[in-house]
Amino acid sequence: MKSYILILFVGLSAVLHSQNTITGTITNTENEKLLGVEVYINELHKGTSTNEKGYFELTNLPSNTLKITVAYIGYKTEIKTIKLTQEITTLNFVLKESVFKMDEVIISTPFNKLQSQNVMKVEKTTLKQIQNQGAVTLNDGINTIPGVETVSTGIGIGKPVIRGLRGNRVLVYSSGIRLENQQWGDEHGLGVDDSSIESLEVIKGPASLLYGSDALGGVLYFNPAKFAKTNELDLNAGHTYFSNTEGSKTHFGFKKSFNSWKFLANGSRSEHSDYKTSDVYRVSNTRFNETNFNSAIGYNNKFISSALRFSYNRSNIGIPEEIGEQTTEKHLELPYQDLTTKMISFDNTIFLGESKITAIGGYTFNTRKEFEDEHHHDEHEEGDLDEDEHDEHEEVFDPSILLKLKTYNYDVKWHLPKSENFEAIVGVQGMHQTNENGGEEILIPNAKTNDIGVMATAIYSKGIHNLQGGVRFDYRSLDTEEHIIAHEDELHVFNALDKSFENISASLGYKTTLFNNIETRLNLASGFKAPNLSELSSNGVHHGSNRFELGNSDLDSERNYQSDLSLEYKTNHFEITVNGFYNYISDYIFISPTREVEDGFEVYEYIQDDAKLYGGEFGLHLHPHPLDWLHIYSNFEMVIGKQDNGEYLPLIPANKLTNTLRAEFNSIGKFKNNFLSLTYENTFKQDNVGVFETPTSSYNLLNFGAGTSYSFNKVNLDFNLNLNNALDKGYISHLSRLKSNGIQNIGRNVVASLKISI
């Protein structure tokens, strides 16, 4: 396969040599030339920046319609659509100043428009914004996005929650393909490291039209790291220290781009000991380590743009059970998880005159090993001590649960020729997946899953009016093998299943501007989620959740219908946003205790009931003139989830109000990009709890942040310092899986990072 791809690239570079060029000059409204403005074409993975005369040049471009994005700090982002019909095209830009964050192109939605032009409201945050929060992991960092929370097991395991929905209801995309890593478990983490990404986009609400089954609750779309600008070499390395866990993270990066070819590689290694609560106790076995490596090669000419990406992620994560031995040891103790994910994606855009085809293929191999300590105790019951110790060593490295998940994805879309006001896309997506057991215990059976979906979507724009809609048909088949497992004088039987599910999804969205400055979006969408392998066929002890889980082969697909209204009012120095939603889910699947006991564990069974979730987010951003350096942010988020019988759904986030003061000083002598921030988080009491939950008290957290950059010659130094939970507040999150044991979340944490870029 690798040889074939290499031959293909070389052949294309030798045969297809003609090219188109775009040149231009970028100025501000005072006709001053701007240095360092980023000029980028997303579909080509190609970019450059302006020189001291404001001049830029992009060569080797296809004869097609392209979107050119121009972005510069302190100015409004501009995007122009241009049809290349001659070898040299001149395109000039005049940028207007803006005190708000740069508008950005949204990749996760089909027409790749600026956020301000998008019919669907999408939250976007950059890697730098996440890192400026001093987050221990990427799981921790996404909590800063309104409407997004995390179900946590210590600090090493985090499960994204979008507006109260999680697990297989939230789809994760990385490097352009869906990330499959047994995401049905609450103690199964995200599996993405921040060193491999450029930014994160969040679709809140059903996105089955775009992504099929499992996008019922929303999508986390991780955009991969960009290639270097044309004919540039970028090198970077950095180190971060975390005081609470006495942990560290080291990363490196390499990028090199030529006119047609481009390369990148980056990696990271992090290690943490048990985290410490406010009462000075360390939570035993919350230690973890993670190794990450990513590489990519890209090629483009006037007919095609391609990117081949590879990523490797391995995590070893302790499973906490109680507060025991107090130590800063980083070597893992039993029980723990050993997780490995390897991903390959091949992203292509083929230009066909007035239209284009995008085609992405991918392969993911996920291995999940769970090591338990019960074998350790059994080995000491009889026999010679030396022999027992040898056997114990063998047992420690023999996982109780071993799951091998192989996934093949494809996604092909035809972007039809555009007219002045109309764009349309038709496409097909699919997946083939196999699950194989290799451990002593079986929780879910060996299985094969096949998906196929066909979709069509279109947008009509005229003046301030934008109307977008689409329809999609999906089909999923699931076949499992029969297993008969002898365990403690009992037989656990996994009956073979042959199931199929189908669904039609649709969406309709409208965007306009009311009263000249209120951007209004109204979206109606339906989605679905077929029952996953765990929900249909579990039959065993799940040590990660300390319960015996029993599947239900009679489950139907979940279907939901959501309405979403978004209002944005913006002036030069003031911005306010209001988002409200109502989400009705038929046949909502959840796990419930049966009050029976099996193998010493309480039995939980998957059942269904209709449910509804509603709530929203409120945001305010004030930039008080003439205090151009000061920004005031306030965000409030809430969600309520109920079954049709009036009972509350479990694991629904508490209401939260976050207020931030941020001071930005672009230049102080040779120091640039200086900032100071103060954030006060007020999480309210959660007493809208499920039948088997208990209320959670309110709490307040105070966080500080500061950062600066210093440049000399071609070397740039970035330094960040964060003090999170500055008052060392003792608290327990409602979404913490350690709440039932009365174990607090992490206490005060000082985070210091230094990054060197050349």
Protein language model regions, located:
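Outer-membrane beta-barrel translocator/receptor signature
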Residues: N181-Q183, S196-E198, L209-D279, T286-N292
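Gram-negative outer-membrane beta-barrel transporters
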Residues: F581-I585, E602-Q686
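N-terminal periplasmic accessory domains that precede
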Residues: I88-V94, L138-G141, G158-V161, V172-Y173, ...
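C-terminal beta-signal and adjacent terminal beta-strands/loops
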Residues: Y4, F528, Y584-D587, I591, ...
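Flexible loop and strand-edge segments within Gram-negative outer membrane beta-barrel domains
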Residues: H272-V280, S284-E290, I304-I357, G361-T407, ...
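Outer-membrane beta-barrel signature, preferentially recognizing the C-terminal barrel domain
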Residues: K330-D347, N446, F494-T513, N517-E519, ...
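Short, acidic, small-residue-rich periplasmic hinge/interaction motif at the N-terminus
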Residues: T27-E32, V37-N42, T69-Y75, T85-Q131
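Short acidic/polar hinge/loop motifs at secondary-structure boundaries
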Residues: E57-T59, I177-K204
